[in-house]
Regions:
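Glycine-rich segments within core transmembrane alpha-helices of 12-TM secondary carriers
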Residues: 4-11, 92-117
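C-terminal ends and interior cores of transmembrane alpha-helices
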Residues: 30-54
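Juxtamembrane intracellular "pre-TM" segments in multi-pass secondary transporters
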Residues: 151-186, 210
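Pair of pore-lining "gating" transmembrane helices in MFS-fold secondary transporters
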Residues: 1, 65, 177-199
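Central cavity-lining transmembrane alpha-helices of secondary-active solute carriers
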Residues: 1-19, 37, 223-231
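Short amphipathic helix-loop junctions that connect adjacent transmembrane helices
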Residues: 1, 201-220
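Cytoplasmic helix-loop-helix junction between adjacent transmembrane helices
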Residues: 65-100
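Symmetry-related core transmembrane helices of the 12-TM Major Facilitator Superfamily/SLC fold
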Residues: 124-143
Length: 231
């Protein structure tokens, strides 16, 4: 669980690359594809660990790395796309809607998958993960199709200019870090995301070990937790 968060430290680099190319869509689709593949491989690694421990652990490490890269490659350019075509007065509202939709999606997915997953089997988990990967990638592709191009051709004016190809990643980070507001916001995000994600390694194992919840039941519990967060 910690690995895919650690890999997401590359988010800054994904944002830098999308700034330089000014084609956010390709990075979002690329990230979603990696995320889907990583999720499928992660579910496959579970039964493999039981039969071939070393190979299963290697596959799990690889798959969770893919998940981290996928989340970073899709999420950061998406937020950049949102910021580019939102006016200054709309940025906060647009970001709020985006994160509310994310939490709502997590809640619906957690409860739905929890219901379907009982009684648990490795094969059922792989089937559910594969189906979710296909559905989310199709929805993402259809949602983004021609969106950025239509915004570029419309009256919307992107906020900010493309980063010069001569500006390196390190130079870009240094320039941003020199801004006091950027530093304070980074600290705020660090604390808030730490609090939001802290339940991941605690809630579901605790429900299983202390209350004897099955896998599907603890997954539903996580979905209800997200509903509480949403409210």
């Amino acid at each position: 669980i910690a690995l895919h968060y650690a890999v997401q430290l590359t988010r800054v680099n994904w944002g830098h690359l999308s700034d330089k190319t000014q084609n956010r869509t390709q990075w979002i689709i690329f990230g979603m594809l990696f995320l889907g593949i990583g999720g499928i491989l992660a579910s496959i690694s579970i039964p493999l660990i039981e039969s071939r421990f070393a190979q299963g652990i290697l596959l799990a490490v690889f798959s969770y790395s893919l998940i981290g890269f996928g989340v970073g490659a899709a999420g950061t350019p998406l937020l950049a796309l949102l910021a580019s075509y939102s006016s200054k007065s709309q940025k906060g509202f647009a970001a709020s809607i985006t994160f509310l939709m994310m939490i709502l999606g997590l809640a619906i997915t957690g409860i739905t998958v929890g219901i379907i997953l009982d009684p648990y089997s490795h094969q059922k988990l792989i089937q559910i993960t594969s189906s979710l990967a296909a559905i989310t990638n199709i929805i993402s592709f259809l949602s983004l199709r021609n969106l950025e191009k239509s915004l570029q051709n419309s009256s919307y004016t992107p906020n900010g200019k493309a980063i010069s190809s001569n500006v390196s990643f390190i130079e870009g980070v240094k320039k941003v870090w020199m801004e006091r507001e950027a530093r304070l916001f980074t600290i705020f995000i660090f604390i808030s995301m730490g609090a939001f994600s802290m339940q991941d390694p605690i809630l579901e194992p605790f429900a299983g070990e202390v209350f004897g919840f099955a896998v599907g039941e603890s997954t539903k519990l996580d979905g209800f937790h997200k509903i509480g967060t949403l409210i």
